[in-house]
Design a protein with these regions (language model features):
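N-terminal assembly/interaction segments in proteins that build large macromolecular machines
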Residues: 2-337
């Protein structure tokens, strides 16, 4: 059995990142054999990681970069999660996500599955390496996200340099200032699509359905409120059964007026709902849908980083250059939004 010296412990610690006590135990079990000790640490780390599968890893780090390629540029973003920001802010954790990003760039990965099978410097694939690290930190860790964007004139933004929110935008022409500001716009305003045409039809259909229902409810409620007012009852006192009961107890509403309001709500509400002009409902609903597009589509959003002019993103870009436009974007955030 080889002597377990301080130098030997230091070597294994540096190679594995494991704690001193774990290294000493592994070396003792391996009778001083460094290779066996590393394998013991590795196996224990993976086993421990498996026990944490049910736990949530909501903290972490997003590493991102734009690189020059033969065909232009490519922007990459990799997300590695942990359970606490203490682990996520550790040098070893940051080094690991950076290594995964570098390998993704080198291998031009296009999917998260490709990223997970990447071979890292220690010879393990990325998932196995993360599992080993999880065993050392005592926290669940996982590669939870990956994105890339190809094309010329790419700009990446790391919000507040905290590696928790990253965006990549592609412009029609080179403009560093515009690229940075549009990338900040994406971070701040959370667009769901580039433009109206890019919004999935299923989303459009659902938003229109919601807008129609809301419009009908508002029109019916408006008719009911007007009828209750004409009957001499304060509509604010009878807007729900809870309020009616409460206001009767307080003496603010008589039982007779309460019953009158109930009858009006039932009768007028049913009549109005049955006779709503369909075209009017459609017009109002489409107006709501257009508002949704203006708030949710990047090019139509009000630009947040201009000089106070009420311009949308597309208009602001054209004010910088007639041929300047945003062509695509990616947004990645650790938090559920």
């Amino acid at each position: 059995m080889a002597a377990i010296t301080a130098a030997l412990i230091k070597q294994v610690r540096e190679d594995t990142g494991a704690g001193m006590l774990d290294v000493k135990k592994a070396l003792t079990e391996a009778e001083g054999d460094v290779a066996r000790a590393k394998e013991i640490i590795r196996a224990k780390g993976i086993a421990a990681a498996g026990k944490r599968e049910g736990r949530k890893a909501q903290e972490g780090t997003i590493a991102s970069k734009v690189v020059e390629t033969a065909n232009g540029e490519t922007g990459y973003a990799v997300e590695l999660n942990s359970e606490t920001d203490f682990v996520a802010n550790g040098q070893d954790f940051i080094a690991m996500v950076q290594e995964i990003l570098d390998q993704a760039v080198e291998n031009r990965c296009k999917t998260i599955d490709e990223v997970k099978t990447l071979k890292l410097a220690n010879g393990d694939d990325a998932v196995t390496a993360v599992q080993q690290r999880s065993g050392i930190t005592g926290e669940k860790m996982e590669i939870d996200g990956y994105n890339f964007l190809e094309g010329d004139n790419l700009y990446v933004y790391d919000h507040m340099n905290r590696h928790m929110l990253a965006t990549i935008v592609r412009l029609s022409e080179s403009n560093e200032d515009a690229g940075h500001k549009v990338a900040m716009q994406v971070a701040a305003m959370k667009p769901i699509a580039l433009d109206e045409a890019s919004v999935p039809q299923s989303v459009k259909d659902e938003e229109l359905k919601v807008a129609i229902e809301k419009t009908k409810e508002e029109q019916v409620e408006k008719a009911v409120v007007n009828a209750i007012k004409k009957a001499g009852v304060n509509p604010n006192l009878v807007d729900s059964e809870d309020h009616i009961e409460s206001n009767i107890k307080k003496g603010w509403l008589t039982p007779e007026d309460a019953e009158k309001a109930r009858e009006i709500r039932a009768k007028v509400g049913a009549e109005k709902a049955a006779n709503l002009p369909e075209q009017m409902v459609q017009n109002i609903a489409k107006g709501r849908l257009n508002k949704f597009f203006k708030e949710s589509c990047l090019v139509d959003q009000e630009f947040q980083f201009g000089d106070g002019d009420k311009l949308n993103v597309a208009q602001w870009l054209q004010a910088q250059s007639k041929t300047l436009a945003v062509c695509d974007y990616r947004r990645y955030s650790l938090s559920a939004e």
